Amino acid sequence: MKKTLIFALLLALLLSLVACAAAPTETTAPTTEPTIPSQSPEEEEVFKILMIGQSHAQDASWLVCDVLSAEMPDKKFLVADIYQPLHLDQHIKNIKENNAVYDYAEITNGSNLVKTPNYTINVAVKKHQWDLIVFNEATWPQTEEASYTDGDFQWLTDWLRENAAWPHFKFAYNATWAQPISKENYAIGRQTAPDGFRGTYNEKFGGDRTKHFARICELMEKYVETDPDYDYVFHSGTAIQYASETFGVPEGDPERRYELYRDYTHMSDFGRLIVAYQWYCQIFGIEELKEVKVNVIPSHMRTKCAMSYGDLTIDDTMKQAIIESVNYALKNPNIAPPQTARETPVLEPLG
């Protein structure tokens, strides 16, 4: 009897110990967010941007380093552009086949420009630990819904995350500008669109640049701005649309200083500078642009059709246009500006 009682007590004690061991242990230790690995010291001291795309992408990024280094002279910047006039599906094909068909350009503080031909996107994404990678589709495909629903955008995003040298980069989409068609549209440049392009444009938008712009904005809001993969959407097209509708090209502008477009679809130096300031404000969270510190675009940084004119001095008329256009886009990213063209005075070059 006594042995049975002792055995029962021991069994009860053993079961109690097992139950205690199985119970979850509560802890009051604070939980911590996973830390993002730092870049290497030599990479961390330079803010680095890679732009992937075609001619509209090149227009958008070309003067960004000049703007950043003028506005933030104590910091180091590198802006690279990998260019080939292709749509996204063709870029993806070249990535999969590792085709060396791209022109690669790096721009650093002081308008230092180094170009390298026969490059691959595969090499470019690993060349530096990029802080920001930007992509845009060409202006025309940006108006096609299929461009956003065929899976190519997601494929590129996933591939970049898996293959970039630093996978914690920020990702941005650059929303481009609507295309003018004829010299009658203000601030468009010296050339008109080819007949075939003009026919397609007129068929789809009735030759109305405002309708073209509205379509881009509609699809940006529907597909890109709601996509969590993008940290930024740069509203370059809105800033250009405002400048196009507000600041007219004056007569007697032989050096093409005040034009926004150099042809029927591409930016002039002035247009590129407006877009660069749009990027600057959005990247660094500047809610209102109050001053433009870029005073000169060196001749070697100008578009090919304008290099022969030498350096481009950015006068007060241009600076005011930049400030107004960028601030409009910051406050009204997807809203067409009113058509209130004013006469732009012709000022003598300052230098």
Over which residues does each language-model region extend?
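N-terminal low-complexity, Pro/Thr/Ser-rich intrinsically disordered segments
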Residues: 30-48
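Positively charged n-region of N-terminal signal peptides that target proteins for export
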Residues: 1-4, 9
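Conserved SGNH/GDSL esterase-like catalytic core that processes O-acyl groups on lipids
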Residues: 52, 58-150
